[in-house]
Every structure is written in C-alpha cells, then in structure tokens.
Swiss-Prot record:
Keywords: Aminoacyl-tRNA synthetase, ATP-binding, Cytoplasm, Ligase, Metal-binding, Nucleotide-binding, Protein biosynthesis, RNA-binding, tRNA-binding, Zinc. This is Alanine--tRNA ligase. It is found in: Cytoplasm. Disulfide bonds: none annotated. One of its GO terms (molecular function) is alanine-tRNA ligase activity. Binds 1 zinc ion per subunit.
Length: 852
C-alpha cells in the first residue's frame, strides 16, 4: 500500500465512522504561541480549550501538514542523520469533541491497523498510562494482555500546557523485528529502533488548575496522531522513512543532479535535501516568504542548509528549484494549490539560491580559515560575521561544525546579535500596546459583540454601552475637551480591519469621531467631545464623507487583485493591503519586479473594468459554498461559518467584510503611482482612484505647463529630446577623457552597485556625481597614492551603511575609518590586499542588497 493509499484509506475509514474530513490547515497557524503548525491537533486547539463551541458534527478527521523547525519543537539538526526526523511531515488524526471516548477510539484504532492496514497482530504492542485501568481493560478485548505495557507520566500522559485540558495517552507500537534490531535498547520502552510508535491516542479527560490539581472534564475528548511517513515506511517494508516512496523519487532526482549514486550510509546530504525541499515548497506555496526574521527566516535557514548540502555533493549552481516539480508531481494530487503556485515557488527558490550562492564560496573560505585555528570552540565573532556578511544562519555553521565534532561559541554570537539589534532599535521610542491591558473581557461578558450597521446606513441614533479612557480603562463619563473610546450598542462606523482604515465622523452637537478600531471583537470609536457624555446616552451618529472614497479605493483594490492574477498568473496571492480615502496599497506574492508593459496592462485592465459599469453584489454564504463558487479567500485567514462575498461584475469575486461601491463606475479613473519590492518574493503596488486620481492628473497637467514655460515651448517633448541629445554628447566627451574613472555597475533590486579602484581624480566628487545620476546607488571607490590607500563609499536610497562598508574594506587593508550612513571614508596601507578588499566589499554589498 503506497503513501497516497494510506492517506486516503485513513480519511475514508473515519468518514465511514461518521467523521467529517477537515482539510489541512495552514502551516502558519492562527496562534501567536506557535511558529508553525506542528501537530494535527493545532487547528482544533481552541475547541479543546473551550474558547470556541464544538463543531457539528463533533467528530473530525484530517491529514494535517506540519513543520518542526525552529521554536520549541525543532527537528532541524537531526534531519538527514536519523531514519525518522523531518522538518515537514503529515499527521493523520481523528478527533472527538465530547462525543465518543476511549472505548470507540481504541476500537477504531485496532480495526484500522489490523483490518485496513492489515498489520500482523504478532507485531503489535500497546502502552497505557500506569494508572489507566480502563484503557488497559479495553485494549485487552483486542490484544493479549502480555502485549500491553504500563508506563508513567513521561511516556503516557499528555498536556497542552501547565494548565488546561490534559489526560493519559495510549500508544500503538510496531515490532520491526529482532533479526534487524538487537541492541541493548531494543526493548519495549527502550530507546532503540526495533519497536516503532505508529499511533498515539490522547484521552483528554482532565482539567489541570494552576495549583496542579486534576479535575474531570464534563465532556472528555479524543485527540490522536499517526505519522504518515512512518506508516508508509512500515507498509513498504522499509526501516527508514527516507527509503519509502515518499522520499526516494526526490532522492533519485538529487542523484541525477549531482551525478553520484545514492547510498544510505553516506547519503545524509541527499536526505537533507529531499526533506527540506518539501518544507520550502509548501511554505512558499502557502504564502510565507524569505525574510530576515520570524517564519521567513526559518524558511531561509532551511533552504540555505539544503544548498550547503548540495555544495557538499558538488552542486555549485541553483538546483533546489528544479526539485519543486517533483514535489508538486508527488503531492499536488491531494494538495492541489501546489500546482497553481508551482511556477512562482520555483522562481522564488531560484532567486534565493542565487543570493546565497553569491556569497557561499567566500563564506566557506572564512569558515575554513577559522576552522584551522579551532581546537574545540569555534569563534562566536567569526560565526556572527558568517551570518551578518555572508548570510550563513547560525545553525548552518553549527551543522558544519557538528560534522567535525566541534561546537560554536553561541553565547558570544548571541551577544553580538543582541548588540546589533540594540543599535537598530536605539532610535525607537514607543509606549507599548495599551490595548492589551484594556477592559475588553469585562465588556464582552457584559454586552457581547456590538453590531455594525454601516453596510446599510451612514447615520443613526445609538446608545452608549460603555466608555473607556485612552488607556482602555472603563470610565462612567467623558468631560468636555476629553477624548476616549465609545462602545455603541449599534454603530455605523466601520472598524479598521482587512486593510480598510477605520471610519471617522461626527456625533451631532457633541464632538468628533477620530477613528474606529476593533478590539477583541468589539467595535470601538475614538472620540473627542465638546461637552460631557456618559454611559446610557443616546446620540446621533454620522459617518464622514471619506467613507465613500474609502469604498472606491477598496473596490479598486479588488479589481487590481483580479488584474494581477489575470496578467501575472494565479500564483499571485494577497500578502497585505491598506485602503484609505486618498490611496491604496496592495502587497502580493510575485518573484520579480513588474515591467512597465505589465504595469500598463494592469492599469488598463482595471480602467476597462471600471468603464463596464458593472454592478457590485454582496451575498452571505456558507464558507465552503463561497470557496466552491470561486470566491478568493486569503490563505490562512480564519473565517466565520458564514461569510460575506463581494462580486464586481464578472471580474472579481472575493470574501470581504469591508465597505464597497454599488457600481464599479463610481471608482472613476485608476492610476498606479508606484511599484516596489517589500521582501523576497513580495511586491507592492500603490495606486489612486476617484478624486485622488483626478488630483493626480491635475498635478501632472500643472507640472507639464511649468516644464513648457521653463523650456519656452509648446512642445516640451521636442525640447527634451534635444536636451537629451546634448547630454549624451557631453557624456561621450567625458567618457573619452579616459576610462580610469569608469565604473562597472551591477543592478541589484533596482540599485546600482559598484566597487572599483580608480587611478586619478577626486573620489568624493566622483561619488557625488554618481549620486546625482542614479536614484538608488551603492558605490565604494579605492585609490592608491604613495603606498597609501584612500577609500570612500556613498549610498543613496539603498539598505547599506556606508560607514560599515568602508570599515570592512579598511580592515582587510590594515586600516580603519568610518562616517555617516550615506557617506564615509577610510584609509589603508596593505596595497597587495587591494584585490581581496574589492572582492570582499563587492560581496558584502551584494549580500545586503539581495537580502533587503
């Protein structure tokens, strides 16, 4: 039975037992305490804790994609070196929320293992908690008593945290055979590999209080987990997950790419790559992007670890992106979004590979130099330089050292990292998030969530349910001249959410509404009052005219999203947005900058849609029905059971709770004002419509008139072309003066970057001239005079600090220096090292620009 059969067999088995199949939740959970979804129960956590009501039906089954890399649950270091550690894996599970309990859970598990998987009974063993006589006796109905083992809390008691739901658990083990495993640890309860845990059944029957006391839950629940990779290996008679059909096709592809056959004993690098490409593909397909911190940095670490293992196999060029096709081929049948995102994922992987490969050789050279001097502990300073200059994550350096039996000075690395973060934040001042300490829980318990009526009305009379000061503490009144927050029973003011800014307006005869925000489900308006108001007052509310402009920009954002997916491809996914009365901003997944032709096509698409005068239509639909109708939902967004669906003619259909136009013609004109990069794989478009677009056009007309007046012509383009010709002639003359000043620039992320040695001239003046020529520039020049080296760097609109740049170059040349972030100078004296300094300075800047 192959892996697809195991997955489908499991889900279909529990479907036949009345369980509803729940699709795999996103790898990025809606849970601030977790980096990634790392277990099958994570999507159901709020149900187990009672934060949300139990679903109907209250029994579910799923095959959940999981990642364990970074944070508390981190398997990264072991991946490739053991038979069963993975960063990415699939967890099969069945769940009961206060419905069936131990008897049925045990019976279902036994039936599936013996009747569906047909595992031999004489290879199966079971463990229970030492105090769980009930589970022991229930198992004894199915399996011999001498095959049931009792263990303590460490092995057979599960809890979500220090407090909350918990209970004993029971595990099913598979005996892989004494003929294959016969170490002293190969016994039930030992640390050997002979007895392999394949299924864990958690009996959530207690609530643990802060004092450690266990109290029975009124409705005990079931949470189970079975690793697809382990079961697949067993079904195929393999002793390592990597030898199964889940991984061997990927390992075979790696062997083709490096031209070397795979063998298990020396194949750690093959296994690392085959595991890591699964994590990388799924995370990118679900919208995570490479970044300098958080989840995006974990993603970068995983890929760079794989690239380095490719380097060990002799692969010195981008190759990981080529494996994306195989992952999609193997898993796209069940996870169909992989096929839709494949092209974009490949491009993002390829670009990230190029970034790292640009510095890996220099980084490895530095690593090996330090390694030669290391006896036990590798320098933390060098590890930090590898991270900061060459893009080597700390765990990659530690991984390389582990192969040599050495360790890195993590304490020193952490110290340097903390110093860097402190410098970065030195200028920041903030008051913290006062809203986190507000009296919201009390308001929710007393009133529940208040209603928003602004879809249908912009004016109404409403009653004050509660007042809060600006620290979000409850007060009975606000006096004349004071400001604070108001909770109305029903409010026409839209609270900021989904990228749409909050409404403003007025309270007739009382004061102004400055902002509207949503806190813990409560719609609260910030007000400034001219006379006293108190709890219980009934007031006249009016939303400002800005609402209409906000609605136009919000609807234009939907049309823009549709245009991007139509012109660039369906891989485009929203990565963020901001909608205001005079502008919109839309962030989206796309691997490279848009061309001027693409921007023109997008702008035309939106304006053509506006000209169609199509009606806007909103419907309230069941979430699944909405998705099935073709409505676009944000990946990973948590939606209610019933959702609001907005259709703009036949052009756009999305889930959206914001406010919109009645007809797309209200949008008027649409202009794109800027396209830029946000991070690796994420682009941003800024645009205007309606009155803001008209104001922009008026501004252009005024500027054109001013240019015509300055050039003293009614045909400014003719004059401009003439001037451009004259400039071109002057440049040619300058170029002919001599090429000693010529700089070969490289374009990286829209920045011109160059490092060069010049023979003559004033290097500061040269830098100033280049700053005037380019919108975004990073340049470092060196000049030798009488065995001394002058260094100068200039930076304009680029993520490099000139002071740091000249310092690193000067250090190589036995000198020093520094200066501002935009301009700095230094000196050196080691002339024979000047070529090395040029190379290192170039790589330093390249890494900074590529990872910006």
């Amino acid at each position: 039975m192959q892996n697809l059969d195991v997955r489908e067999a499991y889900l279909n088995f529990f479907k036949s037992k009345g369980h509803e199949i729940t699709p795999s939740a996103p790898l990025v959970p809606n849970d601030a305490t977790l980096l990634f979804t790392n277990a099958g129960m994570v999507p159901f956590k709020s149900i187990f804790t009672g934060e949300v009501p139990r679903p109907t039906p209250p029994i579910r089954t799923s095959c959940q994609t999981c990642i364990r890399a970074g944070g508390k649950h981190n398997d990264l270091d072991n991946v490739g070196y053991t038979a069963r550690h993975h960063t990415f894996f699939e967890m099969l599970g069945n769940f009961s929320f206060g419905e069936y309990f131990k008897k049925d859970a045990i019976a279902y598990a036994w039936e599936f293992v013996t009747q569906v998987l047909k595992l031999p009974v004489d290879r199966l063993y079971v463990t229970v908690h030492e105090s769980d006589d009930e589970a022991f006796e229930l198992w004894a109905r199915h399996i011999a008593r001498d095959r049931i083992y009792r263990f303590g809390d460490h092995d057979n008691f599960w809890q979500m945290g220090d407090t909350g739901p918990c209970g004993p658990c029971s595990e099913i083990f598979y005996d892989q055979g004494g003929e294959h495993f016969n170490t002293p640890e190969d016994y039930m309860g030992g640390d050997g590999d002979r007895f392999l845990e394949i299924w864990n059944l958690v009996f959530m029957q207690y609530e643990r209080s802060a004092d450690g006391k266990l109290s029975p839950l009124p409705k005990p629940s079931i949470d189970t987990g079975m690793g697809l990779e382990r079961v697949t290996a067993i079904m195929e008679g393999k002793f390592s997950n990597y030898d199964s059909s889940l991984f061997m096709p990927l390992i075979d592809e790696v062997a083709k790419l490096c031209g070397k056959p795979y063998s298990y004993d020396s194949g750690a690098s093959y296994r690392v790559i085959s595991d890591h490409i699964r994590s990388v593909t799924f995370l990118l397909a679900q919208g995570t992007t490479f970044d300098k911190e958080g989840r995006g940095y974990v993603l970068r670490r995983i890929l760079r670890r794989a690239i380095r293992h490719g380097y060990l196999l002799g692969i010195k060029e981008p190759f990981m992106y080529k494996l994306v096709d195989k992952v999609c081929e193997m898993m796209g049948g069940h996870y169909t979004y992989l096929n839709e995102k494949k092209a974009a994922v490949k491009e993002q992987v390829r670009l990230e590979e190029e970034r790292f490969l640009a510095t890996i050789a220099s980084g490895l050279e530095l690593f090996n130099e330090e390694l030669a001097k290391t006896k036990e502990i590798f320098s933390g300073e060098t590890a930090f330089k590898l991270y900061d200059t060459y893009g080597f994550p700390l765990d990659l350096t530690a991984d390389m050292l582990r192969e040599k039996g050495l360790k890195v000075d993590e304490a020193k690395f952490d110290e340097l990292m903390s110093e860097q973060k402190a410098r970065a934040k030195a200028a920041w001042k903030g008051s913290g998030d006062k809203s986190s300490k507000g009296d919201f829980k009390q308001l929710l318990e007393e009133f529940g969530e208040n209603k928003f009526s602004g879809y249908d009305e912009l004016e109404r009379q409403s009653k004050i349910l509660a007042l809060l000061d600006n620290d979000f503490k409850r007060v009975q009144n606000l006096r004349a001249g004071e400001s604070g927050w108001v909770m109305f029973d029903v409010t026409p003011f839209y609270a900021q959410s989904g990228g749409q800014t909050g409404d403003t307006g007025e309270i007739t005869g009382v004061g102004k509404v400055l902002d509207t925000q949503k806190f813990h489900g409560l719609n609260l308006s910030q007000v400034e009052v001219g006379k006293q108001i108190k709890t219980g007052d009934v007031l006249n509310l009016k939303v400002s005219d800005a609402r209409a402009e906000i609605a136009r920009h919000h609807s234009a954002t939907h049309l823009l999203h549709a245009a991007l997916r139509k012109i660039l491809g369906t891989h485009v996914a929203q990565a963020g947005s901001n909608v205001e009365a005079d502008r919109l901003r839309f962030d989206f997944s796309h691997p490279k900058a848009l061309t001027s032709e693409e921007l023109e096509m997008i702008e035309k698409f939106v304006n053509d849609a506006v000209a169609s005068s199509a009606a806007a239509k909103t419907e309230i639909m069941d979430i699944e029905a909405a998705k099935n109708s073709g409505a676009i939902a944000l990946f990973g967004e948590k939606y209610a059971e019933n959702v609001r669906v907005l259709s703009l003619g036949n052009v756009s259909k999305e889930l959206c709770g914001g406010t919109h136009v009645k007809n797309v013609s209200e949008i008027g004109a649409f202009f794109i004002t800027k396209e830029s990069g946000v991070s690796a794989g994420v682009r941003r478009i800024e645009a205007v419509c309606s009155r803001a677009a008209l104001n922009l056009a008026r501004g252009f007309r005024s500027e054109l008139a001013e240019i015509s007046n300055e050039l003293k012509t009614n045909e400014p383009m003719v004059a401009i072309k003439k001037l451009k010709g004259e400039v071109r002639e002057l440049k040619d003359k300058l170029k002919n003066i001599g090429d000693s000043h010529a700089i070969a620039f490289t374009s990286i992320n829209d920045t011109k970057m160059g490092v060069a040695v010049v023979k003559s001239g004033d290097i500061k003046t040269m830098i100033d001239n280049y700053k005037n020529e380019f919108a975004s520039l990073a340049i470092l020049l060196l000049q030798v005079n009488d065995d001394k080296i002058a260094i100068a760097a200039g930076v304009k609109n680029a993520p490099i600090k000139a002071g740091e740049w000249v310092k690193m170059a000067a250090k190589i040349l036995d000198g020093n220096g520094g200066g501002r972030d935009d301009f700095a100078t230094a000196g050196g004296k080691n002339v024979p090292m000047i070529e090395t300094a040029v190379k290192e300075a170039f790589e330093f800047a390249k890494e900074k620009l590529l990872n910006a």
